[in-house]
């Protein structure tokens, strides 16, 4: 089962394709162990143009997405209208959202239509299937493909930017890239059955992380740094950049990291001033009680807490 909260109704199926007569219920309450920041929510069904992406053998009916004609094609695809651009390469946590129901092609879809003429309520659906026979042979899967390259046109991604990239089916998972494209695949195993997608979307988030390393020469280090005696201070570059938001995702610099400093051997009156905190680093000045750069210079360590880990 995917690690997504909710109740799962499970039936077993043998190698002949025959389902078990009964089912069982499992409730999954996923632990919330690590703080995270949601940066992207896409609902294709509630977009200004619902299900406005590219369609192959699927159509919109009654506000929902379904196979155009199972008798002609048992599989169809829908490519999400929105392509996610993080602005740089990160490892991203993605989770799907699907609300769907299977139905019999051409069957009545109201209680009045389903109840045979002359049948009393007490005689109807004694097996518990009030909306008709169970439909266990339809499915809907969301897949994602990604690219680490920037948009070829310099502004926004198109399908051609993902040429040669493979779609990977997921329920939730972590994927590396800058651009992410999503696709839904609908499948029926019977020409008599179809599937209706009522809600469709994905959410994406970054986990909180702590950075203590910095770039020094061509490598990274966690050793204490030495402050600068210059009035311009010392620029520190994080070992790995954070995600801080874009104009389309939360807002530019909406998620700047929080930086803590420990001065080693600080004298009375010594203090620090931080500036230019960004996705990639910060500037620090360590000053004495007269507001001058400390002399001799002092060593210090830092701890930055933010979201996402750049590649």
Where are these regions (language model features)?
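Hydrophobic beta-strand positions in extracellular immunoglobulin-like domains
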Residues: 12, 96-98, 288, 306
């Amino acid at each position: 089962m995917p690690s997504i909260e909710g109740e799962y109704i499970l039936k077993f199926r043998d190698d002949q394709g025959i389902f078990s007569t009964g089912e069982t219920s499992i409730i999954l309450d996923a632990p919330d162990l690590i703080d995270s920041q949601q940066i992207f929510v896409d609902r294709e069904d509630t977009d200004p143009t619902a299900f406005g992406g590219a369609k192959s053998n699927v159509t919109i009916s009654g506000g929902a997405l379904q196979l155009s004609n199972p008798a002609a094609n048992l599989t169809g695809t829908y490519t999400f209208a929105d392509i996610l651009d993080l602005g740089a390469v990160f490892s991203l946590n993605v989770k799907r959202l699907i609300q769907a129901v299977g139905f019999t092609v051409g069957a009545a879809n109201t209680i009045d239509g389903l109840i045979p003429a002359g049948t009393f309520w007490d005689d109807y659906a004694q097996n518990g299937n009030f909306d008709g026979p169970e439909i266990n042979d339809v499915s809907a899967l969301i897949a994602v493909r990604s690219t680490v390259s920037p948009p070829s046109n310099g502004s926004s991604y198109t399908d051609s930017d993902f040429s040669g990239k493979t779609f990977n089916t997921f329920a939730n998972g972590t994927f590396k890239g800058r651009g992410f494209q999503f696709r839904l695949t609908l499948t029926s195993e019977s020409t008599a059955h179809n599937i209706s997608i009522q809600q469709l979307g994905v959410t994406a988030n970054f986990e909180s992380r702590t950075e203590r390393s910095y770039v020094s020469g061509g490598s990274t280090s966690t050793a204490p740094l030495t402050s600068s005696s210059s009035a311009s201070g010392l620029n520190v570059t994080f070992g790995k950049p954070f995600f801080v938001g874009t104009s389309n995702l939360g807002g530019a610099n909406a998620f700047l990291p929080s930086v803590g400093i420990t001065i080693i051997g600080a004298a009375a009156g010594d203090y620090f001033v931080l500036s230019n905190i960004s996705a990639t680093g910060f500037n620090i000045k360590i000053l004495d009680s007269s507001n001058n750069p400390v002399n001799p210079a002092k060593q210090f360590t830092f701890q930055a807490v933010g979201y996402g880990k750049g590649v």
